[in-house]
């Protein structure tokens, strides 16, 4: 219903996933504690109240893919932000023998590629944007599946100038996720004019990351020209 109403307003609907994590307080973890990355025989390390799923195991990949795909099949969802906000620790797998534990990291990355390949083939209309704690997954491998990647969680317009300049030395501007964020900036507290924030974001994919109903009218009046 929500997606239909959004579409009726002439807008497309997007969703933000973080599918590579598992909460200890979840039915999935209680049923399959060995699906979390951990050194066999030792307790895993929680971070952000999460463990990382062991994507070196095909059964884990299939399970997570189906969970994501079932949501996308349920409605006209045309954008996905695929996020990964946790470092990998306790690099070990209950699905690999002792002499092949070193394969985990490589197999993990191949599994992410596999899931995103399946996703873009089943949903060819989908705009996929990768993200990992900001721009940690900004690399050619991810760009094969997603035409844009979130450049950095630092959305301060002044700092973004240097971030985007450096990224543009290697990657096209069209790949760099860049938004007009709120003011004062959530991370630095810096106040930057709305026009300046718009100009900086226009050097990337451009979007708004704020509540437009709560910004000053003079700023709101600039939006039609920025998006034209």
Question: Can you say where each PLM-predicted feature lies in the sequence?
Answer:
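Aromatic-lined carbohydrate-binding surfaces of glycoside hydrolases
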Residues: 1-5, 9-48, 65, 69-73, ...
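Short acidic, glycine/proline-enriched helix-loop-strand junctions
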Residues: 94-102, 126
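Conserved beta-strand positions
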Residues: 82-84, 130
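Glycan-recognition surfaces
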Residues: 23-62, 106-213
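Residues at the N-termini of beta-strands
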Residues: 78-79, 127
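Glycan-recognition and catalytic regions of carbohydrate-active enzymes
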Residues: 209-228
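Alpha-helical packing segments of well-folded alpha/beta enzyme cores
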Residues: 2, 60, 64-71, 112-115, ...
